[in-house]
Amino acid sequence: MKEYRVYLERARSRQQDFLYPLIFREYIYGLAYSHNFNRSIFVENGGYDNKYSLLNVKRLITRMYQQNHLIISANDSNKNPFLGYNKNFYSQIISEGFAIVVEIPFFLQLSSSLEEAEIIKSYKNLRSIHSVFPFLEDKFTYLNYVSDIRIPYPIHLEILVQILRYWVKDVPFFHLLRLFLYHFCNWNCFIPTKKSISTFSKSNPRLFLFLYNFYVCEYESIFLFLRNKSYHLRLKSFSVFFERIFFYAKREHLVEVFSKDFSYTLPFFKDPNIHYVRYQGKCILASKNVPFLMNKWKYYFIHLWQCFFDVWSQPRTININQLSEHSFQLLGYFSNVRLNRSVVRSQMLQNTFLIEIVSKKLDIIVPIIPLIRSLAKAKFCNVLGHPISKPVWADSSDFDIIERFLRICRNLSHYYNGSSKKKSLYRIKYILRLSCIKTLACKHKSTVRAFLKRSGSEELLEEFFTEEEEILSLIFPRDSFTLHRFHRNRIWYLDILFSNDLVNDE
């Protein structure tokens, strides 16, 4: 945030709050490269970071300055001098630059709102996505119905650009952004296909995620306004979800604009026990009341997307289920409410009674099948979960191979330590351990048994299972009972800023 403030102040001294000049500054692309290089991920990234160089950036900026090169022919985009022979590479650099520039004013607004709320010290802890699960454990055990909602993608990227125009008043910047989107990313057709959306999101992830998250923020601002108008008890805990950038100003703006139209509490949405949780493009709506009110919210979402955002959504895509009978998926976990029944003997005078007590507990389970499917896609095992070697890593040293497998295993263990049942997590560790051994045996052109016999013993890769115990022993007393208890219980971490990349939440 400090770097953003410095760069924006430097631009203000020259161009009166315009974002357009920042596109032609070399340090913006250096900042984008630094952000990608330092991002903590679970699977190694083979993106354009290794190809980044200041010479490429200077060459790109020089071509952008020459306005005649910005007149693009859609039929001749592969030979355009603006992109040269590295169309995809330059396109990715430009998209990273756009994302950095357009994020600057919103990061500044976010930092100022944090300073006003006096919660800077706890900001990093509150950013952890694991902080969502204690909320679920505390609230969802008292609820009966859950609605699993997938927020639809906009039919055209122009909708996202139009939404962004309400917040950033810089016409030249949006002209250049549209030029980039329509000609470099194949968005010049009236209705882009699902394949083109997927291609753009993979080749330009940062810019796409920013535009998509901004679209979600717009939808949630309207949802929050109507939710607050439907209850006598106003919502107070929404501010901890900091991904809703510039949320306070938007909420005040909505209250000011629509106060005349909604001057009384909406009677048809009254539900004092409704909870809403979202991460990325998926949200969970849970309630204690009958499904009738949940259906009202369901059709409200559908009409909101269709009327305000021109996004088509089918009612069958939103399911309403009982929490005790169905599970929902969020942040790479499967969650459901389990009923625990216990019998208590009670005695009054000479009479004895048996009382059955039913309590609810939120079960959060590791999704073993999607994880095995992701491991199979990454060539660590087959579709049945049988470990296989990874020959593409055989050129590395033994230490590097072991370190790569350990890094993935460590991050998976770190992320899924909050699960109710750890057996699935141990199975994933077992797959990675055997895959590592088979990769080393393949490198040395030997069988697994001969390699382990030559190496000394099967304790060669014991770090896969002992490292977590060593970390816990540094935090808690070195007591076997204590460590065993923490291995069985859930452990949520406050430094998880990204979801597990091996679970594709689609």
Swiss-Prot record:
Entries under InterPro entries matching the protein: Domain_X, Maturase_MatK, Maturase_MatK_N
Pfam families xref list: Intron_maturas2, MatK_N
One annotated GO biological process: RNA splicing
Signal peptide stretch: none
Domain of life: Eukaryota
Locations listed in the record: Plastid, Chloroplast
Any one Gene Ontology molecular-function term assigned to this protein's record: RNA binding
GO cellular component terms listed in the entry, alphabetical order: chloroplast
Keywords: Chloroplast, mRNA processing, Plastid, RNA-binding, tRNA processing
PANTHER family attached to this UniProt entry: MATURASE K
Family: Belongs to the intron maturase 2 family. MatK subfamily.
Role according to the record: Usually encoded in the trnK tRNA gene intron. Probably assists in splicing its own and other chloroplast group II introns.
Protein's recorded name: Maturase K
Originating species: Trifolium albopurpureum (Rancheria clover)
Gene name as annotated: matK
